[in-house]
Every structure is written in structure tokens, then in C-alpha cells.
Regions:
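Terminal connector regions
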Residues: 110-136
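Acidic, glycine-enriched loop/beta-strand segments at the rims
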Residues: 213-223, 535-541, 549-559
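Asparagine-centered strand-capping/turn motif at beta-strand->loop junctions
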Residues: 56-64
């Protein structure tokens, strides 16, 4: 890798590996990046469902302005609005959900009405009246739809300031019957709120109209229902009395959160966290990390038990990995009984082949996970010896670029082993010029080294290999490295776990299209459309959500 001409001798991130203009959008080429820009798939959309529609004339006899919102039962509207109320029975205004119609004092206007869906639409049919006539189905501009309810099927959404574009694959919301909370909106009694909902059926919390980005579900516009602290559905929320196809019931006790125009993802699982201070917890939450797997220094059992109690009030999932520091019978059992979610083998406490073998045998017998930080001194074993000790059993190998510790300089060779699940940490992703420099201080600080001791500096510098750092991105792109975590309070920062993962996906999009990737196995369908990176984004999101959850045995609960 060469340096740029104006910085001789310096390494630039992936310099020369991608074209100067790697299919960037017009906004990026002009320097005017529109954060979260949306490319609309249509110019307009039909309003609401295909139901009976009529129009009638309404006159305001009041001395005051009267407004009626979209889903208010028109037949029950202000008595000083004069119109054929029998004809309006079972209908509501045919306008966007959450909008309203205004009548000035004395004003008369013709309005369109649409029949309610659900039970109301079926049970409260009234005969046609001479005061009404059929009305066409109105349309709403795609721009207004986006402003009110967020993107819909086929729309493309840019992730932040990256060159990654999501394509909305499906819209499960109730078009025309959206639950919208606020002044004059639809999430009220007799509208999208089901007043007779039972406690067992109504949601505790509704996240309405979010763009769900999930490695399993895909990219779906949907309402998210929460009950008893768990997500119980991703679908269509509302009141079955007035809307069709409702599978998530909004009741009088449901707390609404408006997700229109927002992205909802699974909470990230940071599977390498040194939890040495509670100050990490708000940082994790603010950055989208909701599950922490600690890095294995939480023993003795008394401390583990007290730690779990102390963290009980935090809205986070905490898994304490215990340090596997001895293969003496009975010691690991004590840690499991104290609440350990798994074990961590670390070179600072010994990563000998016989210890690796014993701990993996114990983990297999007790169905728990093991994470591994290998012997960087080569004091007891080299890479091949560690692989032999693992013997085809499943283990999670941390920071395989080697800078965080482990066999030097060839730790990355672990990616060849099918049973070894490799991860890398945020401070080297995506690779940049400051990464090698930063890690000299990091390694000394976190591993008991001293600047004044030449031997300590020599050990540190032997660990830092810019070439393996630079190789991490392409190996992630090929799937050889499957997890991103932070090594917070060790190598990295918990506030960067999600952000660095997405930045890596962005960088690798450019690398994949550049000359450095020629001859590398590709994903052809993904390369066809520069405005559809959906599969890439889902793959990379899995690296900090689903994949670590599976590896640590908690995917039934999180990820």
C-alpha cells in the first residue's frame, strides 16, 4: 500500500485500492452530502385502502372555526356542522391520517369520505343518501407521504453521510389508518385506539411506522409492538374496530412512540467489553449497544454476584464472562454457579495449550461459550499449537488482527479454521493512518507496560502490524471475520461499535468496486445498483447484533 503524493511515507486508509470516484452519488461528488437522503420510488401514492367513498356538503353554522380530524367519526362531529349525518354513518374524512379539515364560520364545502375498515365498516353500513355521490380515491404526493409517515416500499434511504443505500423491501403499516399521536391526530379514543382492548391483548408500548433494519427480518416499514418488556410483533398496529388487518392492538394503556422517519435496529451486542467502570453503561446505551458481554476479569464469584445485583436496575443485558485462569477441577464450576455466561482465556493470565484444551472440554460439557486471547509471547505455544489444542471445537477468537494481543505476526491465520469464530475490534476499523500509532500507548497502558523500560516498548512494537490491520476490512467483506466488537477500556471504545461497523461497510463498498478487489470472489447482484446496498448493510449489521448473540448462546433473547 502506497502513500498519497502529498504525504510521502504515510499510509492512507485504503489509498489506491478504489477508484477516485467510486460511484458516489451526485450529492457526494458536489460535496453537498444530504444526510439520510431518500430517493423516492414513485411520484405519488393512492390514499388509504380501496373502500367505499362518497362526498357530501358540510356547512359550519358556528361563529367559531371548527376542525375535524381524519378519523373522527363524522356523524358525531360538532352539532353546528350541518350535513346528512345518516349518510356519514360509518365514514370518516378521506384525508391523510393525522390531517384535519377546517371550516371557517359560515363556510360550506364539499368533502370526501371513506368507509371505516374493521368491524365498524362492516356493521355500520348506511344506505346511500341523496346528499351524497360517489367520490374517487384521492392520491397523495410521495414527498408529502415521506414527510408524514417516512419512506415506503421501493424507496431508497441513505445511511447518514455514507454511500450506503437501503431499499425498503416491504411496508406492513396500515396505509390510510396510520396511528399518529398528537394534537388532532389519530391515536385517540374511537379512532386507532381500541377502547375495549383487554389487558392481555393491548400493547404496552407501540413504536409506530419505523423502518426496521434487521438481519433476519430485512428492511421493513412496520409498527413494533412491545408487551411485558419484549417485542411481540413487527406488523400493523391499530384498532380492529376501524382498521383492517390489525395484528397489534393499541389500547388505552399503550404508550406510543412515533417512529415515522426513523430507523429501528436490534440493539447491538458488544461481545468484548472490559467493564471496569459503570460510566460505560450510558455511553453504550447512547450508541445503540444494549447487550454487553464482558471480557473475562469479573471473578471471584462474590464480585460477580454483587456486580450482577448492582447492574439489575440498568436497562441493559449484561453477560459476565469469567476468566479461565486454571484447569484445577472445581474452579470453573464455581464461576458458572456465580452467574458466568461463559469463559475467557487470556494470555495475561496464561493461554497454554493444556489450559485451552481443559476449558473447551469443560465448556462442551456445560454448554457454554469460550473466548480466546492467544499467547503473543510464544512462550508456551505458537499458532499451530493453539489450533491443535482447540482441536476443531468452537471458540471465539478476539481481535485477530493481532494488535490487541495474541500470536505474532500470524494470528490472522485463525480465519482459516472453520470452528474458530473470529472477531475484530473498532479502533482498527476501517483502517486508517492513526491506528498503528494509537496502539503503542494503548498496549502499554492496558497491559502493565512502562515507557521507560526498553523491553516493554519492544514487546509492544512487535504486536503492531499495519498490514494485518489493513487486511481486516477485506476479510470482513469476504465473511472470514464475522464479528465486530469494541474491546472497550482495552483497545477500543464502546460508543463506536455500531458506527465503525457501518463505516466499514461503506469503505468496503468502495474497495469492492476498485482494482484491489479484482479477482476476489464477488457478490454480483449487490454490485449492479449503486443505490441498493440492502444486503451489504444487513450483513454488516449482523456483525454487531445477530452473530455475537449466536456465538455467546443468547440469540433466543437478543440480537
Amino acid at each position: 500500500m502506497s502513500g498519497p503524493r502529498d504525504q510521502p511515507g504515510k499510509l492512507a486508509p485504503l489509498h489506491g485500492s478504489a477508484p477516485d470516484d467510486p460511484l458516489r452519488s451526485d450529492e457526494l461528488r458536489s460535496g453537498e452530502v444530504r444526510l439520510g437522503a431518500v430517493r423516492l420510488a414513485a411520484t405519488d401514492h393512492p390514499l388509504g385502502a380501496d373502500r367505499d367513498r362518497i362526498s357530501l356538503v358540510v356547512r359550519n353554522t358556528s361563529r367559531r372555526v371548527v376542525r375535524v380530524s381524519s378519523h373522527y367519526p363524522l356523524e358525531r362531529a360538532n352539532p353546528k356542522l350541518v350535513f346528512d349525518r345518516e349518510a356519514a354513518r360509518g365514514f370518516h374524512l378521506d384525508i391523510p391520517a393525522g390531517a384535519s379539515v377546517r371550516w371557517a364560520p359560515g363556510e360550506e364545502r364539499e368533502v370526501g369520505l371513506v368507509r371505516y375498515g374493521g368491524l365498524t365498516g362492516e356493521e355500520r353500513r348506511s344506505p346511500a343518501s341523496i346528499a351524497t355521490r360517489p367520490a374517487p380515491r384521492p392520491r397523495i404526493s410521495a414527498a408529502e407521504w415521506l414527510a408524514r409517515y417516512g419512506p415506503t416500499t421501493g424507496d431508497r434511504v441513505r445511511l447518514g453521510d455514507t454511500d450506503l443505500w437501503l431499499r425498503v423491501q416491504e411496508d406492513r403499516t396500515a396505509a390510510g389508518d396510520e396511528p399518529v399521536w398528537g394534537y388532532g391526530k389519530t391515536l385517540r379514543s374511537r379512532m386507532t385506539q381500541h377502547d375495549r382492548a383487554t389487558g392481555s391483548s393491548e400493547l404496552d408500548v407501540l413504536v409506530a411506522g419505523a423502518l426496521v433494519v434487521d438481519p433476519v427480518v430485512g428492511v421493513v416499514k412496520a409498527d413494533i409492538g412491545i408487551k411485558d418488556g419484549r417485542i411481540v410483533g413487527i406488523g400493523r398496529a391499530g384498532n380492529p374496530d376501524v382498521s383492517d388487518g390489525v395484528d397489534l392492538v393499541i389500547g388505552p394503556h399503550t404508550e406510543p412512540i412515533m417512529g415515522y422517519g426513523l430507523i429501528a435496529t436490534p440493539g447491538a451486542v458488544d461481545s468484548h467489553v472490559h467493564l471496569i467502570t459503570p460510566e460505560l453503561l450510558p455511553v453504550a446505551l447512547s450508541a445503540g449497544v444494549t447487550t454487553l458481554i464482558t471480557a473475562g476479569f469479573e471473578e471471584p464469584p462474590y464480585v460477580m454476584e454483587r456486580t450482577l445485583r448492582a447492574l439489575e436496575s440498568w436497562p441493559l443485558n449484561i453477560g459476565l464472562q469469567a476468566g479461565a485462569r486454571a484447569d484445577v477441577p472445581g474452579r470453573l464450576e464455581e464461576l458458572l454457579a456465580a452467574g458466568a455466561v461463559g469463559f475467557k482465556i487470556h494470555e495475561d493470565y496464561g493461554a497454554y495449550p493444556e489450559l485451552i484444551d481443559a476449558v473447551l472440554a469443560f465448556a462442551d460439557a456445560h454448554d457454554c461459550s469460550v473466548s480466546l486471547h492467544t499467547d503473543g509471547l510464544h512462550e508456551s505455544a505458537e499458532l499451530e499449537d493453539t489450533v491443535a489444542a482447540i482441536a476443531g471445537r468452537t471458540v471465539h477468537a478476539y481481535h485477530v488482527e493481532g494488535t490487541g494481543g495474541g500470536h505474532m505476526p500470524d494470528l490472522m491465520g485463525l480465519v482459516r479454521e472453520a470452528s474458530i469464530i473470529c472477531s475484530s475490534t473498532t479502533p482498527t476499523l476501517p483502517y486508517g493512518v492513526a491506528a498503528p500509532i494509537e496502539h503503542v500507548a494503548m498496549t502499554l497502558l492496558n497491559h502493565g507496560g512502562l515507557w521507560a523500560v526498553p523491553g516493554d516498548l519492544e514487546l509492544v512494537r512487535e504486536r503492531i502490524h499495519p498490514a494485518t490491520m489493513a487486511a481486516e476490512g477485506p476479510l470482513h467483506e469476504l465473511g472470514a471475520v464475522g464479528i465486530v466488537n469494541s474491546d472497550s477500556q482495552g483497545m477500543g471504545r464502546i460508543g463506536e461499535t455500531v458506527r465503525r461497523t457501518i463505516q466499514l461497510a461503506h469503505t468496503m463498498k468502495g474497495w469492492r468496486r476498485g482494482p484491489a478487489a479484482e479477482g476476489v470472489p464477488g457478490l454480483p447482484a449487490e454490485l449492479d445498483d449503486p443505490y441498493d446496498d440492502t444486503e451489504r448493510i444487513l450483513r454488516y449489521f449482523a456483525k454487531c447484533t445477530l452473530e455475537p448473540a449466536i456465538v455467546h448462546g443468547i440469540s433466543e433473547e437478543v440480537g
